[in-house]
Amino acid sequence: MSENIYGIHAVSAFLNNAPERLIEVYALKGRDDKRLQPLLNELHRLGITIQFVNRQTLDKKAEGEVHQGIMARVQPAKELNEADLDTLLQNQSNPLLLVLDGVTDPHNLGACLRTADAAGVCAVIVPKDKSAQLTAIARKVACGAAEVVPLIRVTNLARTLRELQQKHNIWVVGTAGEATNTLYQTQLTGGLALVMGAEGEGMRRLTREHCDQLISIPMAGSVSSLNVSVATGVCLFEIVRQRLA
């Protein structure tokens, strides 16, 4: 079993973080791209064979997605679970976690991973059910973050939140449009898990019930909500601002 990744950032990040899992690389024949050439040079330096193919072949392998002239077939990584999360948190003094409840669009998952990496999130937690997979699309949108931010899939999200609270003393903050306390009125400087719900539906009932606090993003215009990846960025960087203050 293998996975495909495509795009300059995604393949480059994979090469930097897990070169041993690269099976084969395909590149567009005759393409003169200053952004692509350093990656091709590094692949050559490491002795990784590149198969140069025409656009029709590469488009077909990338299933019509924008590939920027390169794609790779790779061995899938081991799926991380609750035990891996527990091990990770043992080495964290003031962890920041992102929890995505019911986010099923791989574009949104990739965008959230990219933002999580920029904000210093130590892991992203998702439920095994009703959650986007880490597809080639998600990896490309993540621009390399999918290879460095641990993605933890848990069987029971409510139970995981409870263990974060009781075992690791992490404050669980959920986002909800109707919450009276806003993001900017809330102290978010300690060990924290930020929970983002699906667009339109929000968090599931059990997830909401396991939050220590609910907060909202104040909205001044006529729209009632933001895209989940945009809302995630707004919340995470307010947390970053508070931690740097």
UniProtKB/Swiss-Prot annotation:
The keyword Protease does not apply. S-adenosyl-L-methionine binds at G197, I217, L226. It is found in: Cytoplasm. It is an enzyme of class 2 (transferase). SMART domains: SpoU_sub_bind (SM00967). It catalyses: guanosine(2251) in 23S rRNA + S-adenosyl-L-methionine = 2'-O-methylguanosine(2251) in 23S rRNA + S-adenosyl-L-homocysteine + H(+). Keywords: Cytoplasm, Methyltransferase, rRNA processing, S-adenosyl-L-methionine, Transferase. Its EC number is 2.1.1.185. Belongs to the class IV-like SAM-binding methyltransferase superfamily. RNA methyltransferase TrmH family. RlmB subfamily. Specifically methylates the ribose of guanosine 2251 in 23S rRNA. HAMAP family: 23SrRNA_methyltr_B. NCBIfam families: PRK11181.1, rRNA_methyl_3. This is 23S rRNA (guanosine-2'-O-)-methyltransferase RlmB. The gene is rlmB.
